[in-house]
Amino acid sequence: MSTSSILHLVREDLRAFAGYSSARTSALQGDVWLNANESAWGNPADPSASTRRYPDPQPQGLRSALAALYGCAPEQLLIGRGSDEAIDLLVRGLCVPERDAVLVTPPVFGMYAVCARLQNAPLVDVPLVDVPDGFHADIPAIVAAALASNAKLVFLCSPSNPAGSAIALDQIEPALQALQGKALVVVDEAYGEFSEVPSAVGLLARYDNLAVLRTLSKAHALAAARIGTLIANAELIAVLRRCQAPYPVPTPCAAMAEQALSAPALEVTRRRIAEVRSERARVHKALVQLPGVRQVYPSQGNFLLVRFDDAEAAFQALLEAGVVVRDQRAVPRLSDALRITLGTHEQNERVLSALQRTQEAAA
């Protein structure tokens, strides 16, 4: 796809939109900064006075570190307040209300639908297919529905939350080919570090109608810092940056994130990812052997989706043991399911023990 065709997917009224020009976006130099109406003094709670200045809208050190981590150029990357902001920017930037549709694959992360509804964009559901080896995306059905509905955005969550399944790149590629010039395919890789499937970022060199979402909230343990990343065609990134709030990345969060991407920190993160993968296999094996457990879905994430004969009893037993899991029973097609995040070995043992006691009491 050419640059002109990728920009053709952007709302007509935003293609030349200049956005807000903040004081930090100017290239002026000096050592006395009086251009942003900031305080000349630090707050007593901030002895270093480092937070009295507005932050860099896209911190260059962090942007470079994230680009190195994800294997893209810095200009292909937009940092935002979690993946949620990137999802919202994509929907607002590409979808004309009441005209351009957003396609999702339920059961799936709810923010795609929330953002679509806030934009009054038509929502198209192509449910995941529930087969004996887990939930799977029906790519031919997704492509057909996207073309029939004139969808502007197609969200593919891989690994999928809460289903846990990942989409192989050789399945994503036909969707990119079929939807060139018609829709942007957004691959949400929030749980990508836990997956054995390679990142879709490698496909960007061939497909400009691809965007990839990443986050430091999961594997990198920085959920409170709200550091999300959108990776896409550089021209599209530039347009969306102009649609973004002026100062999306607080300075303390950027500094912490940059430290988290240092070599020593990344080594610790890699070890913890390996531990999660090991625990995922162990807990999966233990759960399927418990009476009352109907099905444990294979997972490429840091969680397991589990169906129970009595999900209410299982949920209450875990609460009584002090364990809070995600109740999925209000989600269509998951009325008997709980999503259990993988914790430490000791935390996972607590889950298994509580569920074992429940089944023994019911016997």
Swiss-Prot record:
It comes from the Bacteria. Its EC number is 2.6.1.9. GO terms for biological process: L-histidine biosynthetic process. Pfam families: Aminotran_1_2. Keywords: Amino-acid biosynthesis, Aminotransferase, Histidine biosynthesis, Pyridoxal phosphate, Transferase. InterPro entries: Aminotransferase_I/II_large (IPR004839), HisP_aminotrans (IPR005861), PyrdxlP-dep_Trfase (IPR015424), PyrdxlP-dep_Trfase_major (IPR015421), PyrdxlP-dep_Trfase_small (IPR015422). One of its GO terms (molecular function) is pyridoxal phosphate binding. It catalyses: L-histidinol phosphate + 2-oxoglutarate = 3-(imidazol-4-yl)-2-oxopropyl phosphate + L-glutamate. Pathway: Amino-acid biosynthesis; L-histidine biosynthesis; L-histidine from 5-phospho-alpha-D-ribose 1-diphosphate: step 7/9. Its cofactor is pyridoxal 5'-phosphate. The modification N6-(pyridoxal phosphate)lysine is found at residue 218. Homodimer. PANTHER family: HISTIDINOL-PHOSPHATE AMINOTRANSFERASE, HISTIDINOL-PHOSPHATE AMINOTRANSFERASE-RELATED. Belongs to the class-II pyridoxal-phosphate-dependent aminotransferase family. Histidinol-phosphate aminotransferase subfamily. NCBIfam families: hisC. This is Histidinol-phosphate aminotransferase.
